C-alpha cells in the first residue's frame, strides 16, 4: 500500500489529504475538463475503486447542477452494465465520487489500440479468438457482444425515462472478463452481488459499463428537450440544428459508436459542430463502409437505420431493442464460447403466455408485468442465448441463472449499496422491469432488411492522413459542447413569425379565426423564455429531415434583402474607422455561394407612412404601441450590428482567410493551417481572440434582447389582446426578426470558431504569462459570458471598454473632419455609429425593459440603461458623451442642410437665367460698332 501511495500523481500529492472517507487515493488514471480520476482502495477490504475528484472552483453554476444531477441519477441506478456509485464525499474544495473501477479503460482506447490487444493479459484470449481485420475495426463477435451490453443499459434507462445525451466510446468503460478477474488477486469493490456479472453478451469477453451521467436527465417519451449537449462527433443532427429533441438522440449516438467499432473511426469527422452538421447533411443518409470491413449485412443495415438525420425516420427504441442483431445469437463463436443448451431449462418454460402484438403494448405490459413471467418467457430471443453464452460452463449456467436471474433483472435497490453511505429511495412498483425482457421471435415483418445487393460498395480511403488523425484526436479531447435554450428560441420564434406573417389581414375576424384559436393554447403571457411553444412548431419538428425540407434560413444564410446594404452607413463607418486605426478597410463585398458574408449590415427598411401604422384611426393607441415595439426591436438590432461590425474587424485580423466560399461559417480548410499563414504571434492571437469573443457575445446579447421584445409582442398579438394590427407593421417586424435570426446564428457560429482559436492559442502561452488559464480565476470565466465552456479571459478585457474606446476614436476623427468641413456625410455616419455603440455600452440584459416596451408603456430615454454593469459615475459619463456627440451630429446635419439649400438655390438661379435667355458669359467682352 505504501508503494501505491508513492506512485500517486503530482496533482494528488498537492492535495491536503490522501484519504477520502474510507478510501485511499492512489495514482491518477484519467483526466477530464473539470475532474481528475484516481485509482483508490478501500481501507479495510483493500478493494479497488475509481475516485472522480471534481474541483468546485472550476465549476460554474450550470456545471455544478450537472454534477449534482449526475450524483442523484447514479444513486438511483443499479445495473450490471452501468457504472455504479459507491459513495460521495464532499469537502470545501472538492466533490469526490467513489465509483466502480474499470481496469481496461474506455472503448475509444480499446478501438485505437486494437492491434495491441493480444499483448495485454486481459484481452489476449479475446484477440486470439477474434482478431481484428487489417484496416478495419473490431471483430464482429466483439461488436455484437458490446452492442448487447450497451442496449441492455439503454433499455434500463428508457424504462426509467432517462436520456443519457452523451453516449460515446469515451463513456463506455471496460472490465476484464469474470474468469480473468478471479484468477488475479486484485479485488474490485462491488456495488451489489451481481454488479460485476454481465447479463448479456459473452462471459469470456470484457464487460462494458455505461458511465458519465453528467448530461443525463429524465425525459419521458412524449417530451422534448432543447439544450445542446454531448460530444460533437457523436451528437445527433437535431441537436446540432438547435432543434428540440427526444430520447432518440441517444440512438444516433449508438449508431456512431457502432460505426466506429466496425471501421475504427467515427462516421463523420469535423473540427467543430457546424462543420459536422454540414457533413451530415451532405451525406443525405448514405452511410458507406470501407471495402476492408467484413461484417454481415444486417449489422450494416442496423447502423444505417440508426444514422438517419430525421428522428422520425430513425429506428425507434422498441424496434432497436427487438432487433435480431441485439436479441439474436452471436454468430461466429469459437471454442468455449459456442453455446451449449442446458437440458433442465426446458422443464421450466411456460407455454401459454401470449405475446404482445405491438411494441407500445409490449412496453406497457413489461412495465407492469411480474418478474417471474419476465424471465421465464418461452420465446425470448435474449434470455435463451443468455443462459448459454453468459457463462462458459454449461453446468454452472442453469444453477447461476436460477439463483440470480430475478435479482439481476430487477436490479433491486434493497441489496445494493448497503453500508456505503448511500441513502436510496424505496423502489417503485415497476422497479422490477427487466432490462432485457422477452420479445416475439418472429419480427421479420416489422424489421425488413434491405438486400445486400442494393448496397453499392464504394472504395474509401483507408489510411488516415496525419491531419485527419490530429483533428480526430482534438475532438476526442474535447469533452462536450453546451449551447443553451436561447438558440432554440430565436429560431423557433423566427419560424413562427415567418409562417404567420399575415396576422394583420382580416382584422375583423381575428378573434374567431382558426389561427387565433390554435395559439390560444400557449403558455402564460408572463413567460420569460422568449420562445412561444406552439403545436405548429412541433408539427414542423416532425417534418424535419424529409425531402424538400429547406433550412437555409438557419444555416445556409440568404443574403440581406436590403438593396445596397453592402454600402450602408454603418458599413462605411466601420471601414473608415478601421482604415484610421489599422491601416486597411474591412471588405464588405459579397461573395457568391452559400457562405455567409463577413459583415452583413442591418438592412434599412422603408419607413411606412403614419396612416399605414394607424390603420383607420380607431386603434391608434394599439398601433402606437406596436410601432414602439417595432422601433425598439430595430434599435437593438442596429446596436447589435454596430458591435458586430467592430467584432468583424478583429475577426478579419484573426482569420484573414476565413470564411471562404468553400469553407463558410467561419471554418478553415482542413489541409491548411493558420498559425503559419496569418503571421500573428501567440500573444496577438490571444488578444484578438479575446476581444472578438467578448464583442460577439455582446452582439448576441443585443440580438437576444430584440428577440425577447418580438416574442412578447407576438405573444400578445396571438392571444388577441389586441385585434387591430397593421399588416405593414407585421411585415416590418417580421423582416427585422428574420434578419436577427440570421445574424444570431452567424454570430453564434463565428464565436465558436473564435473560442476554439482562443483555447488553442492559450495552450501555447508560457506558464508565467498573465493570460495563461492557470493564472485565471472564476471572475475571468464569468466575464466571458460563456463560462459553461470554460473560456478564460485576461483580466480587464470587456466588450464595454472596447466599444467605448472605439466610439471615442470614431467621434474624434469625425470631429477633425467636421472642423475642416471635409467628408461631412462620413462625419454623420461616424457620429451615428459612435452613439449606437455607446448606447450598447449602457445596455444591459434586463428583461423588464423588454416587457415594458412590448406592453406599450412609455419608453424612457435611458430605459435600457437600468441595471447596467457600469457604476453611476461611469454611466453618467457615457450619457454625457452621447449628449455631446448628438450635439455634434445635429451641427453636422445643419451644415449639410445649409449646403444642400445653397446648392439648390444656386441651381434654381442658374435655371432661371437659362429660361430668361441670359446665357452670355459676363467675362466675354461685347464688340459693338464704333
Curated annotation (Swiss-Prot):
Molecular-function annotations in GO: ATP binding; protein serine kinase activity; protein serine/threonine kinase activity
Reaction equations catalysed: L-seryl-[protein] + ATP = O-phospho-L-seryl-[protein] + ADP + H(+); L-threonyl-[protein] + ATP = O-phospho-L-threonyl-[protein] + ADP + H(+)
Subcellular compartments: Cytoplasm; Preautophagosomal structure membrane
EC numbers: 2.7.11.1
Record-level GO BP terms: autophagy of mitochondrion; cellular response to nitrogen starvation; cellular response to potassium ion starvation; piecemeal microautophagy of the nucleus; protein localization to phagophore assembly site; protein transport; regulation of autophagy; reticulophagy
Residues in Protein kinase domain copies: 23-326
Disruption phenotype: Blocks autophagy. Leads to reduced conidial germination under starvation. Especially, leads to reduced CP15 levels in conidia. Impairs growth of the mycelia on host cadavers and considerably weakens virulence.
The protein's enzyme class: transferase
Induction statement: Expression is reduced when the vacuolar protein VLP4 is absent.
Biased composition range(s): Low complexity: 377-393
Bias (Basic and acidic residues) ranges: 337-350
Region called ATG13-binding, residue ranges: 629-897
Entry-linked PROSITE patterns: PROTEIN_KINASE_ATP, PROTEIN_KINASE_DOM, PROTEIN_KINASE_ST
Domain notes per entry: The LIR motif is required for the interaction with ATG8 and for the association of ATG1 with autophagosomes.
PANTHER family: NON-SPECIFIC SERINE_THREONINE PROTEIN KINASE (PTHR24348:SF22), SERINE/THREONINE-PROTEIN KINASE UNC-51-RELATED (PTHR24348)
Assembly and interaction partners: Homodimer. Dimerization requires the presence of ATG13. Forms a ternary complex with ATG13 and ATG17.
Protein name: Serine/threonine-protein kinase ATG1
Amino acid at each position: 500500500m505504501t508503494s501505491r501511495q508513492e506512485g500517486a500523481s503530482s496533482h494528488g500529492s498537492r492535495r491536503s489529504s490522501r484519504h477520502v472517507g474510507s478510501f485511499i487515493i492512489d495514482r491518477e488514471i484519467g483526466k477530464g475538463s473539470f475532474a481528475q480520476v484516481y485509482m483508490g482502495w478501500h481501507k479495510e477490504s483493500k478493494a479497488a475503486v475509481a475516485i472522480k475528484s471534481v474541483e468546485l472552483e472550476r465549476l460554474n453554476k450550470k456545471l455544478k447542477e450537472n454534477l449534482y444531477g449526475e450524483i442523484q441519477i447514479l444513486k438511483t441506478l443499479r445495473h450490471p452494465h452501468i457504472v455504479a456509485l459507491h459513495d460521495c464525499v464532499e469537502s470545501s474544495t472538492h466533490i469526490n465520487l467513489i465509483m466502480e473501477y474499470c481496469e481496461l479503460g474506455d472503448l475509444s482506447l480499446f478501438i485505437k489500440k486494437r492491434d495491441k490487444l493480444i499483448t495485454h493479459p486481459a484481452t489476449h484470449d479475446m484477440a486470439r479468438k477474434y482478431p481484428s481485420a487489417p484496416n478495419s475495426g473490431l471483430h464482429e463477435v466483439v461488436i455484437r457482444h458490446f452492442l448487447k451490453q450497451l442496449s441492455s443499459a439503454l433499455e434500463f434507462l428508457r424504462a426509467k425515462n432517462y436520456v443519457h445525451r452523451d453516449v460515446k466510446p469515451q463513456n463506455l468503460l471496460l472490465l476484464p472478463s469474470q474468469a480473468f478477474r478471479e484468477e488475479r488477486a486484485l479485488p474490485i469493490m462491488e456495488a451489489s452481488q451481481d454488479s460485476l456479472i454481465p447479463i448479456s453478451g459473452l462471459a469470456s469477453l470484457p464487460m462494458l459499463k455505461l458511465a458519465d451521467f453528467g448530461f443525463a436527465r429524465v425525459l419521458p417519451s412524449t417530451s422534448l428537450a432543447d439544450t445542446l449537449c454531448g460530444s460533437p462527433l457523436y451528437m445527433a443532427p437535431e441537436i446540432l440544428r438547435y432543434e428540440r429533441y427526444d430520447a432518440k438522440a441517444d440512438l444516433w449516438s449508438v449508431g456512431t459508436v457502432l460505426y466506429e467499432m466496425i471501421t475504427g473511426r467515427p462516421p463523420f469527422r469535423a473540427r467543430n459542430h457546424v462543420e459536422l452538421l454540414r457533413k451530415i447533411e451532405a451525406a443525405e443518409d448514405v452511410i458507406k463502409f470501407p471495402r476492408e470491413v467484413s461484417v454481415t449485412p444486417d449489422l450494416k443495415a442496423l447502423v444505417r437505420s440508426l444514422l438517419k438525420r430525421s428522428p422520425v425516420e430513425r429506428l425507434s427504441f422498441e424496434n432497436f431493442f427487438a432487433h435480431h442483431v441485439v436479441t439474436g445469437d452471436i454468430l461466429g463463436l469459437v471454442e468455449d464460447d459456442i453455446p451449449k443448451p442446458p437440458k433442465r431449462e426446458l422443464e421450466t418454460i411456460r407455454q401459454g403466455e401470449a405475446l404482445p402484438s405491438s411494441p407500445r403494448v409490449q412496453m406497457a405490459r413489461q412495465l407492469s408485468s411480474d418478474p417471474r413471467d419476465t424471465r421465464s418467457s418461452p420465446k425470448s430471443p435474449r434470455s435463451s442465448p443468455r443462459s448459454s453464452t453468459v457463462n462458459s460452463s454449461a453446468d454452472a449456467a442453469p444453477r447461476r441463472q436460477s439463483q440470480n436471474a430475478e435479482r439481476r433483472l430487477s436490479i433491486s435497490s434493497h441489496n445494493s449499496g448497503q453500508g456505503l453511505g448511500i441513502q436510496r429511495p424505496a423502489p417503485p412498483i415497476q422497479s422490477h422491469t427487466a432490462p432485457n425482457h422477452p420479445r416475439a421471435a418472429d419480427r421479420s415483418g416489422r424489421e425488413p432488411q434491405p438486400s445486400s445487393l442494393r448496397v453499392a460498395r464504394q472504395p474509401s480511403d483507408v489510411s488516415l492522413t496525419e491531419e485527419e488523425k490530429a483533428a480526430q484526436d482534438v475532438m476526442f479531447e474535447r469533452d462536450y459542447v453546451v449551447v443553451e435554450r436561447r438558440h432554440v428560441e430565436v429560431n423557433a420564434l423566427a419560424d413562427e413569425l415567418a409562417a404567420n406573417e399575415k396576422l394583420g389581414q382580416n382584422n375583423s375576424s381575428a378573434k374567431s379565426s382558426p389561427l387565433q384559436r390554435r395559439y390560444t393554447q400557449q403558455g402564460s403571457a408572463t413567460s420569460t423564455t422568449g420562445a412561444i411553444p406552439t403545436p405548429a412548431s412541433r408539427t414542423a419538428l416532425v417534418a424535419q429531415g424529409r425531402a424538400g425540407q429547406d433550412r437555409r434560413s438557419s444555416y445556409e444564410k440568404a443574403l440581406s434583402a436590403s438593396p445596397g446594404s453592402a454600402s450602408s452607413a454603418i458599413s462605411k463607418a466601420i471601414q473608415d474607422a478601421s482604415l484610421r486605426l489599422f491601416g486597411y478597410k474591412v471588405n464588405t463585398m459579397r461573395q457568391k455561394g452559400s457562405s455567409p458574408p463577413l459583415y452583413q449590415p442591418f438592412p434599412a427598411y422603408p419607413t411606412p407612412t403614419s396612416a399605414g401604422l394607424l390603420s383607420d384611426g380607431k386603434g391608434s393607441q394599439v398601433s402606437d404601441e406596436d410601432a414602439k415595439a417595432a422601433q425598439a426591436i430595430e434599435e437593438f438590432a442596429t446596436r447589435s450590428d454596430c458591435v458586430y461590425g467592430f467584432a468583424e474587424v478583429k475577426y478579419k485580423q484573426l482569420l484573414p482567410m476565413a470564411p471562404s466560399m468553400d469553407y463558410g461559417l467561419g471554418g478553415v480548410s482542413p489541409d491548411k493551417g493558420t498559425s503559419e499563414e496569418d503571421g500573428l504571434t501567440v500573444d496577438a492571437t490571444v488578444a484578438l481572440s479575446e476581444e472578438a469573443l467578448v464583442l460577439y457575445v455582446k452582439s448576441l446579447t443585443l440580438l437576444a434582447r430584440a428577440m425577447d421584445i418580438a416574442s412578447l409582442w407576438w405573444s400578445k398579438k396571438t392571444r388577441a389582446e389586441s385585434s387591430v394590427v397593421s399588416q405593414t407593421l407585421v411585415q416590418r417586424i417580421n423582416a427585422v426578426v428574420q434578419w436577427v435570426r440570421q445574424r444570431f446564428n452567424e454570430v453564434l457560429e463565428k464565436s465558436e470558431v473564435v473560442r476554439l482559436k482562443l483555447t488553442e492559442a492559450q495552450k501555447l502561452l508560457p506558464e508565467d504569462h498573465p493570460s495563461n488559464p492557470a493564472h485565471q480565476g472564476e471572475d475571468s470565466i464569468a466575464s466571458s459570458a460563456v463560462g459553461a465552456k470554460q473560456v478564460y479571459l485576461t483580466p480587464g478585457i470587456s466588450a464595454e471598454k472596447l466599444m467605448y474606446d472605439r466610439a471615442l476614436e470614431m467621434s474624434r476623427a469625425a470631429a477633425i473632419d467636421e472642423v475642416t468641413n471635409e467628408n461631412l456625410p462620413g462625419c454623420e455616419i461616424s457620429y451615428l455609429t459612435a452613439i449606437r455603440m455607446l448606447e450598447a455600452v449602457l445596455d444591459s440584459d434586463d428583461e423588464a425593459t423588454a416587457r415594458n416596451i412590448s406592453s406599450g408603456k412609455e419608453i424612457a430615454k435611458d430605459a435600457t440603461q437600468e441595471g447596467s454593469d457600469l457604476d453611476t459615475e461611469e454611466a453618467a459619463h457615457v450619457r454625457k458623451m452621447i449628449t455631446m456627440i448628438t450635439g455634434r451630429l445635429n451641427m453636422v446635419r445643419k451644415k449639410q442642410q445649409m449646403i444642400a439649400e445653397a446648392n439648390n438655390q444656386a441651381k434654381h438661379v442658374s435655371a432661371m437665367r437659362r429660361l430668361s435667355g441670359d446665357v452670355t458669359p459676363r467675362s466675354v467682352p461685347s464688340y459693338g460698332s464704333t
